[in-house]
Every structure is written in C-alpha cells, then in structure tokens.
C-alpha cells in the first residue's frame, strides 16, 4: 500500500482486472487499470509527484506506463495509459 498524507493507494486484482483502490479523506475510489491478461505483472509504483493541488502516481507493469492524477481538492481522478513499443524482432 502506498500512502500520502491525503491519499492511500492499494492495488488489487478484481475479476481479472488490475484495480487501484484510492482512499482519500472522505471517500474511496476504484480505478480500473488494465486486464491481467495484457498486464500480467502487478503494477508497481515508480514515483509520486505532489504539486499545486494534485498528486500524480506513476506506475509500471512490463511495457505499460500508467499515471494516476488525483485532484486533491475535488477528489477526482484521471488515468493516462501508455504502452511502450515492443522490442521483439519479428523476422518475416
């Protein structure tokens, strides 16, 4: 579990979907991150950045890069997902 003064985060696998559980002062939010079939490794926290009323949690799982942006005043969230290109060579 990752903890910030105003936000706690836990990652769970719910029905084959990696899900972030965000616990804020007055409520909790579930945020679906991706299918465990396409993201087989549990996402791990790379960094957290707090600035001007928002907290950004940067996670990775294999080629997946995820940024969860939490607007602290309103408790709303935004998920930005990037999948890095494969480095495998396919000889055709």
From Swiss-Prot:
GO terms for biological process: positive regulation of protein phosphorylation; symbiont-mediated suppression of host gene expression; viral process. Keywords: Eukaryotic host gene expression shutoff by virus, Eukaryotic host transcription shutoff by virus, Host gene expression shutoff by virus, Host-virus interaction, Inhibition of eukaryotic host transcription initiation by virus. The keyword Cell membrane does not apply. It holds the Pfam family Bunya_NS-S. Inhibits host transcriptional machinery, by producing modifications to the phosphorylation state of the C-terminal domain (CTD) of RNA polymerase II. Inhibits phosphorylation at serine 2 in the heptapeptide repeat (YSPTSPS) of the CTD of RNA polymerase II, suggesting that the elongation step of transcription and/or 3'-end processing is prevented. Inhibition of host transcription machinery leads to shut off of host cell protein synthesis and inhibition of the host innate immune response. NSs also seems to be involved in the nuclear relocalization of host PABP1. Belongs to the orthobunyavirus NS-S protein family. This is Non-structural protein NS-S. It comes from Bunyavirus La Crosse.
């Amino acid at each position: 579990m990752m903890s910030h003064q105003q936000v706690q985060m836990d990652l769970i696998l719910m029905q084959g979907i990696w899900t972030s559980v965000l616990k804020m002062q007055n409520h909790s939010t579930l945020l679906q991150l991706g299918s465990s079939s396409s993201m087989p490794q549990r996402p791990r926290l790379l960094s957290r950045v707090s600035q001007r009323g928002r907290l950004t949690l940067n996670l990775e799982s294999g080629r997946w890069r995820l940024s969860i942006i939490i607007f602290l005043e309103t408790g709303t969230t935004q998920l930005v997902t990037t999948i890095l290109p494969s480095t495998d060579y396919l000889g055709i």
